[in-house]
Amino acid sequence: MPKDVTVESFELDHTIVKAPYVRLISEEVGPKGDIITNFDIRLIQPNENSIDTGGLHTIEHLLAKLIRQRIDGLIDCSPFGCRTGFHMIMWGKQDPTEIAKVIKSSLEAIANEITWEDVPGTTIESCGNYKDHSLHSAKEWAKLILEQGISDQAFERHTV
């Protein structure tokens, strides 16, 4: 008999969140005492829009690099299937406000500084879908998201 489980993201009421935001989902302690922190990095308001796959894919590759340049402890930052944001998993306890500042800074770099040569993992050898990238789209989405401001709270706007 399969055990009964609750998947937190399917319990979240997507109609009341106010994107863009960073939301602490959970802090979990492993069997050896290690702590991991799980964040909902929601860039687009759910069920109102979504980022095209080329733009999202390029944002994903850039965040993998840019976040690590700004803060230690990143395990993974992977896009949601709904294409409205990312799950970000980190070692240790992490502050949502600090993470929101890191995301804001990373998006500012994407919008204003990044060139195609800066995008990691865009060759057939380094990416499983290397043809599905769009720096133009990534930049346009980053600008739109930044215009709205990044909040460190999901249910009311508190921009960083």
Swiss-Prot record:
Q: Which GO biological process annotations does it have? A: quorum sensing
Cofactor dependency: Fe cation
Any keyword Iron? yes
Q: Does the keyword Cell membrane apply?
A: no
**A single Pfam family, by name?**
LuxS
Query: Which reaction is catalysed here?
Result: S-(5-deoxy-D-ribos-5-yl)-L-homocysteine = (S)-4,5-dihydroxypentane-2,3-dione + L-homocysteine
What molecular functions are annotated in GO for this chain? iron ion binding; S-ribosylhomocysteine lyase activity
According to its UniProt record, the EC number is: 4.4.1.21
The record, for Gene3D superfamilies, names: S-ribosylhomocysteinase (LuxS)
Q: Which UniProt keywords apply?
A: Autoinducer synthesis, Iron, Lyase, Metal-binding, Quorum sensing
The record's remark on the cofactor is: Binds 1 Fe cation per subunit.
Signal peptide bounds: none
Q: Which residues bind Fe cation?
A: 57, 61, 127
Q: What is the protein's known function?
A: Involved in the synthesis of autoinducer 2 (AI-2) which is secreted by bacteria and is used to communicate both the cell density and the metabolic potential of the environment. The regulation of gene expression in response to changes in cell density is called quorum sensing. Catalyzes the transformation of S-ribosylhomocysteine (RHC) to homocysteine (HC) and 4,5-dihydroxy-2,3-pentadione (DPD).
What is its quaternary makeup? Homodimer.
Q: What family does the entry list?
A: Belongs to the LuxS family.
Identify the NCBIfam families for this entry: PRK02260.2-5 (NF002607), PRK02260.3-1 (NF002608)
What name goes with this protein? Answer: S-ribosylhomocysteine lyase
Q: Which taxonomic lineage is given here?
A: Bacteria, Bacillati, Bacillota, Bacilli, Lactobacillales
Q: Coding gene? A: luxS
